[in-house]
Each structure stands twice: as structure tokens, then as C-alpha cells.
């Protein structure tokens, strides 16, 4: 893999985010759908406080960022622009953190360029939802964890959880890598304490907070899950969610038993297991694993199929009468995406090509 100056990576990432900003820009007649814009019309345009005056299905920090953007912006365009600036700043932090991890691991920065700046998912989904911000906090937490700056890592881990809850499945695996029970307890207290305190305060202020924010997702149906082929009817989706939980537990157990020596690969495997087992796999979630693929220093062939399928999901979504139905084009692409991600996971699990096989001299 060729060597790349970090300034090129930053420039390319900024260009991709600018393109993402433009294709979702709400004033354009042919703009591609973005969750950010939809939030505006759900009550943020009236400056309503999330969790208190407005039900919002994302964790507290996500709601605060959306609210702050709505206050700073007087209309949908300025709101969208402020939100995009927040995402762009977070994404540049993600790029910098990933570059530092690559340098520490002696991995060519060409991987960071490809995965973080040139991937179609970055163009389509960076200015879309909270996932880029979540990934930034999570990877920063991982970076400081590997630097043994445990307190800072735990704080960033808690921040990631306040944006999206998913990273909590990583906590036991991170704790096992700490040398003493004192460190493990400290990491758990900081990670869960900040997260718990914020959520407890909101629950006290609004007893419906937990139901409206977290249990909301438990009632959501199957969306882009590969196992829709086994549960095509909505009447079977409760069973599908049990199947999803079984897959998650089985996959995490396999990761634990495997005992990855390389922490970056382990985190990738855990997130890949979650994405493949969850009954909701929205396309922007792929942003979580791109920095990890870059830091692993490998170019899996299925990656190209993964990106193609992931891009086509949103491009075909509004071209289909019922995009969540089995047999629709988005669900065919979701199935292909799952197959590609599973192949990448197998490569990582069995060490095909070995992690970081291409190192810089």
C-alpha cells in the first residue's frame, strides 16, 4: 500500500463530507433523504426540548446536539448546516485518531485514505445521522485505552454511549484487557457512572424517558436484517428478535473464546457481530467499522461488495413501494451486504492474510 500524506487524507475527507452535505441539502428538490432533516420536522423546528417536551429515540447527548443545532439555526437550512459542521468536526477528529492508531501500528496511511475518505458510505452517510459522531468518540476511547490512559478512555466511552448505546457491548472485553481489578472497576464506574447519571436525571424529570428513548427500539420492526428471509411476516418479528438476541450472544461468545491478541481486530469483530445479529442494520452503521478496517491494515476483497450494497440501500429505498419487505431491492442489497460483511468477519476471525500484513517501512 502506498504512503499518503495526512493532509491528503484530510482534504479528501473534507471533500467527501462536503459532497455528503450537498446531496442531502434540504433546499434541493432532488436531495437524498437524511435523518438530520427529518428531526427538524419532528419538533426541533419549534425548539422543543428533547426528552422533556419531545420524545426522541436517541440517547441524551444525541438529542442535545440536535437541539443545539436547532437553536443555532433559524430555519431548516441553517439548522442542517450547523448540524453538519458538528459532524464534520467530529469526523476530522475520527480521521486524526485513526491516523495516529495506524502510525502506532505501522500501518500505511493509504488505508485511512481509502476507508475514511473515499468509501461511498462516507459520502452517502456521514452527514446523515449521529453515527460519525459516535464513531469518533468510540475510536478516540479505543486509542486512549491502547495508550493506557484509562480515565480519559472511560470518559470518551461514556460519551459514545450517550450518543448511541451500542458500545456498551464492548465494555466486558475492554475490562478483561486491564491488568487489575482496581483498573477494571475504575473503568466500569467512569464508563457507566456518567452515562447512568445523565439518564437517571432525565428519567426523574420525565418518567416516560426510558420508554420513549430506549424501549422505543425494542418495538421497532426488522429493518435491513439478513434474517428477514426466515421471518418475512410482521407477526413473526417477536420471534425474530429472540433469534437476533441468540445470534448476538453466540457471536460474542465466539469472540471471547477466540481470544484475539490484537485489540483493534477484536473490536471490529464485536461490532461486526452486532451488525450481523441485530434486527436493525441501518446503512449508516457501516461508518462504525471503517476506521477499524483502516487500522487493521488490510484490504478485504468483500469490502467492495459491502460498499456497493450499502450504498444501493438508500439509493433504492424510495424507489421501492415497500422497502422493508422481503423481495424489495433494498432488502436484496441488505442481504448481499450481510454476506460481504460476514466474509470480512471470517477473514478477521481466522486471520486470513493476517492483520496488518502490509506495514510501512
Residue ranges and their predicted role:
Residues 49-50, 221-231:
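Extracytosolic (periplasmic/ER-lumenal) interhelical loops and adjacent juxtamembrane/interface segments
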Residues 2-212, 237-361:
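Multi-pass membrane glycosyltransferase architecture that uses lipid-linked
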Amino acid at each position: 500500500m502506498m504512503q499518503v500524506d495526512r493532509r491528503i487524507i484530510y482534504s479528501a475527507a473534507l471533500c467527501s463530507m462536503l459532497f455528503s452535505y450537498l446531496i442531502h441539502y434540504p433546499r434541493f428538490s432532488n436531495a437524498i433523504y437524511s435523518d438530520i432533516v427529518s428531526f427538524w420536522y419532528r419538533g426541533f423546528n419549534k425548539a422543543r426540548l428533547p426528552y422533556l417536551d419531545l420524545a426522541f429515540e436517541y440517547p441524551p447527548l444525541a438529542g442535545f446536539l440536535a437541539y443545539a443545532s436547532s437553536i443555532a439555526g433559524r430555519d431548516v437550512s441553517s439548522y442542517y448546516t450547523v448540524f453538519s459542521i458538528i459532524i464534520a468536526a467530529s469526523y476530522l477528529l475520527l480521521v486524526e485518531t485513526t491516523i495516529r492508531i495506524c502510525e502506532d501500528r505501522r500501518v500505511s496511511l493509504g488505508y485511512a485514505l481509502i476507508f475514511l475518505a473515499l468509501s461511498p458510505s462516507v459520502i452517502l452517510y456521514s452527514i446523515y445521522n449521529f453515527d460519525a459522531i459516535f464513531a469518533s468518540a468510540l475510536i478516540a476511547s479505543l486509542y486512549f485505552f491502547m495508550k493506557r490512559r484509562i480515565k480519559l478512555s472511560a470518559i470518551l466511552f461514556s460519551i459514545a454511549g450517550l450518543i448511541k448505546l451500542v458500545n456498551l457491548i464492548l465494555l466486558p472485553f475492554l475490562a478483561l484487557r486491564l491488568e487489575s481489578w482496581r483498573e477494571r472497576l475504575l473503568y466500569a464506574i467512569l464508563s457507566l457512572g456518567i452515562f447512568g447519571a445523565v439518564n437517571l436525571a432525565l428519567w426523574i424529570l420525565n418518567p416516560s424517558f426510558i420508554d420513549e428513548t430506549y424501549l422505543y427500539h425494542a418495538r421497532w420492526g426488522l429493518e435491513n436484517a439478513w434474517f428477514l428471509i426466515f421471518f418475512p411476516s410482521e407477526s413473526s418479528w417477536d420471534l425474530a428478535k429472540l433469534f437476533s438476541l441468540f445470534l448476538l450472544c453466540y457471536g460474542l461468545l465466539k469472540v471471547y473464546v477466540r481470544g484475539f491478541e490484537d485489540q483493534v481486530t477484536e473490536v471490529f469483530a464485536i461490532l461486526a457481530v452486532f451488525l450481523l445479529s441485530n434486527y436493525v442494520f441501518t446503512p449508516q452503521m457501516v461508518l462504525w467499522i471503517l476506521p477499524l478496517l483502516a487500522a487493521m491494515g488490510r484490504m478485504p476483497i468483500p469490502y467492495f461488495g459491502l460498499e456497493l450494497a450499502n450504498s444501493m440501500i438508500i439509493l433504492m429505498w424510495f424507489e421501492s413501494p415497500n422497502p422493508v419487505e422481503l423481495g424489495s431491492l433494498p432488502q436484496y442489497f441488505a442481504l448481499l451486504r450481510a454476506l460481504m460483511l460476514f466474509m470480512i468477519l471470517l477473514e478477521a476471525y481466522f486471520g486470513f492474510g493476517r492483520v496488518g500484513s502490509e506495514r510501512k517501512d
